[in-house]
Amino acid sequence: MLDNQSRITLWQTEPAALLYAQMLQGCLREYAGLEVPFTRGKPRAGDAVLTVDTALPQNRYTLSIMPECITLKAGSDEALCNGVQTLCQYIEQHGAVLPALEIEDWPDLANRGYYHDCSRGRVPKLDYLKQVADILCRYKINQWQLYIEHTYLFRDLSEAWREDTPLTAQEIMELDDYCAVRHIELVPSLSTFGHMYRILSTKTCCDLCELPDSEKIPFSYTYAGNHHTLNVSNPDALGFVKGLIDEYRPLFRSSKFNICDDETFDLGKGRSKALAEEQSERSLYLSHVKALCEYLVAQGVTPQFWGDIMWRFPESCAELPKETICLNWGYLPHQRENEIRDIAASGITQYA
């Protein structure tokens, strides 16, 4: 049983473990009514001990709750963070009097992701995003993507974001740092093909839109989602989105980048119609996706893209760089496996 003589003791841990001690301290304060200081050094009876044991596999931790002490051993700093989340959950359920317990735990899935739409509706503030990061850490989520169309403050695209409160470079970098110490990889995600309404409806960029004069049609969420695909027959289109990537990617320490490229409903139906009739819609789509993937791979970055369009011709996945990851999504409560099965048969790596 913990009491006011107890300590949260860090033993043979990385400096980052101070944060986990603070997490545990806050949990004990809120749910057990105890103000338990933390320290470093050799633990005593009655302490809650957080320690790294390199004899354990890196992703594994053991939690032992006995009358004389609480001991959390982990194979790595990340596993220690995960173990603290489990201990906090147990304290939330039982308060200061904790039933005896032995746990050995590790993740079955190496990549545990969460996707957050920051483009439709109100743009979240940094303080709120940090709260989300805390929740994701509690649930041991280790990858997080913010979906961005126009809601990042691109320096040359004020026409696109001036009616919103876009996230700034400083905010993204601060959030990236906040996530990193919680073992969450903040992965950049940026529309580079479909879903580019705000950007492609500006006077500066409307010539890059697949549909002529589409910038003159009043905004609606349905219209914006179904139209405003990049006109890949325009020789300036590829360079334009590469420029967006070049401005956005350096803000993140992640070695991944999601180019999205989903729901390109307009492709081959407007300005690129003649080229699509000559080459095929598949060729136009694949050429653009492949060019962006190769561009990222050349910089040591793992490209990701949404698989809804590629599923129409899954054999074409073999033409993409081998490092590419297909993100296979679905919203149904009982999601079918057709898309996952077909993409898997192509040999490409995928997230489901």
Regions found by a protein language model. Give the residues of each.
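Extracellular/periplasmic catalytic domains that process cell-envelope and extracellular macromolecules
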Residues: 64, 107, 251, 318-320, ...
